[in-house]
Amino acid sequence: MKFIIKLFPEITIKSKSVRQRMVKILQGNIRNVLQKVDETVTVRNDWDKLMVSSKNDSPENRDKLVERLSCMPGIQAFLEVTQVPFTDLHDIYEQTAAVYGPTLANKTFCVRVKRKGKHEFTSIEIERYVGGGLNQNFPSNGVRLSHPDLQINLQIENELLYLVTAIHKGLGGYPLSTQEDVLSLISGGFDSGVASYLFIKRGSRVHYCFFNLGGAAHEIGVKQVAYYLWSKYSQSHKVKFVSVPFEPVVGEILEKIDNGLMGVVLKRMMMRAASRVAERMGVEALVTGESVGQVSSQTVTNLSVIDRVTDTLILRPLIVSDKQDIIDQARAIGTQEFAETMPEYCGVISNKPTVKARYEEVLANEAKFNFDVLENVITSAKVIDIREIANETEAQVQEVETTSALAENEVILDIRSPDEHEDKPFNPEGMTVIHLPFYKLSTQFGDLDQSKTYLLYCERGVMSKLQALYLKEQGFNNIKVYRQN
């Protein structure tokens, strides 16, 4: 099994030294991620492309490799190819005909060739010879150069012919870690998830900073989002998840700050804390999901007042994005379901929040704030390797039984997304299975027959454990985690 990796175009226009560095990093990223799935994977650097090879040709392995490659920054597209040697022009035709000839019935087609090396024929001559032979010897609806039903793609490199059997779209962007690290202020909602993704795609290693306003349930929900983004788009590198217990700060604001300024002051306190966390981590920029005009604290004036609290660079990739565009992108990257069911914690509520805060007035209000409270929560911040979320959950979930057997009056609850459920149906013989996606558990679990015990199932086991903790937090005790032997 072979794949040809096409580089993100902006990589190819860099200077030779920068391009070499970026391609080498991408090569390492691909190797790190794919070898977790398939130890036989090798990655070769061919200057203008990367060649990925695997000795495992099973359909299951192929699907896993395609999934991982499609979510890796730095790849514009990748071609699934069959590599064969050839002797002459007619041999190219015969090998192409053996693969594509039977697929031409009732279709228009064309042949496209890319060639590298010295040969006695041109790329156009190959297209004409192979296309003419297929048209004469196989039933079809003829050759159509524009918008054919089937485009046959061939790549020739010296004495090797690559028959392209599938073309997959890549994520684009720069390879992970070619840009500097950032610290994303993540809340679990639509905006912060998309903002984090955009910086991953741009090649930055994204660490996550969460300000907890709602207890364990809130933290569990946000960890799900951060873990999902890391595991799907950036698992080639280690990142940190930082949790800051911010309830005491909210309490101090409610007690000391004028009503209209509460939102702005809360954001300034968050930026103070995040800047300190970033400094300790050696990170020079913060990322937020703020967009001009979306809420009262996000007017240009208020954002300016917020930014003046720190010298740390604050990056806002969504600053002029419409809310619907953000939601659409969240849906595309897979974070919409998390955001829709994320608990809302409006710890600071202003009856009449100002949209044009005066800097001097903000400073006067903050003079009443006890900054020892802020220092204490910064000191109490918990920093973990994001890979430990699964292990941490394992320890926390000990009070929730894990089992691989189904007893009487027990039902397996498949909490995977509809797409996962459809792609890989889970129906073990002799067991009752109900499909209820994880993002509906918070609103629909209580509607189930509570006389039964439910065994939560997902493929990797992380989501089922996190959801078990969340339901436990909500007071449900008829829960176990199901794990296959």
Swiss-Prot record:
Question: Which Cys residues form disulphide pairs?
Answer: 346-458
Query: In which broad location class does this protein mainly occur, judging by the first location in its UniProt entry?
Result: cytoplasm
The active site consists of 458 (cysteine persulfide intermediate)
Q: Where in the cell is it found?
A: Cytoplasm
Q: Which pathway does the record list?
A: Cofactor biosynthesis; thiamine diphosphate biosynthesis
The UniProt annotation places ATP binding at 185-186, 267, 289, 298
InterPro entries (alphabetical): Rhodanese-like_dom (IPR001763), Rhodanese-like_dom_sf (IPR036873), Rossmann-like_a/b/a_fold (IPR014729), ThiI_AANH (IPR020536), ThiI_fer (IPR054173), ThiI_N (IPR049961), THII_Thiazole_biosynth_dom (IPR026340), THUMP_dom (IPR004114)
Q: Which PROSITE patterns match?
A: RHODANESE_3, THUMP
Query: Its catalytic activity?
Result: [ThiI sulfur-carrier protein]-S-sulfanyl-L-cysteine + a uridine in tRNA + 2 reduced [2Fe-2S]-[ferredoxin] + ATP + H(+) = [ThiI sulfur-carrier protein]-L-cysteine + a 4-thiouridine in tRNA + 2 oxidized [2Fe-2S]-[ferredoxin] + AMP + diphosphate; [ThiS sulfur-carrier protein]-C-terminal Gly-Gly-AMP + S-sulfanyl-L-cysteinyl-[cysteine desulfurase] + AH2 = [ThiS sulfur-carrier protein]-C-terminal-Gly-aminoethanethioate + L-cysteinyl-[cysteine desulfurase] + A + AMP + 2 H(+)
Q: Which GO terms describe its molecular function?
A: ATP binding; CCA tRNA nucleotidyltransferase activity; tRNA binding; tRNA-uracil-4 sulfurtransferase activity
User: PANTHER family given for it?
Assistant: TRNA SULFURTRANSFERASE
**Which family is it part of?**
Belongs to the ThiI family.
- This protein is called what? tRNA sulfurtransferase
Q: Which organism is it from?
A: Tolumonas auensis (strain DSM 9187 / NBRC 110442 / TA 4)
Q: What is the organism lineage in this UniProt record? A: Bacteria, Pseudomonadati, Pseudomonadota, Gammaproteobacteria, Aeromonadales
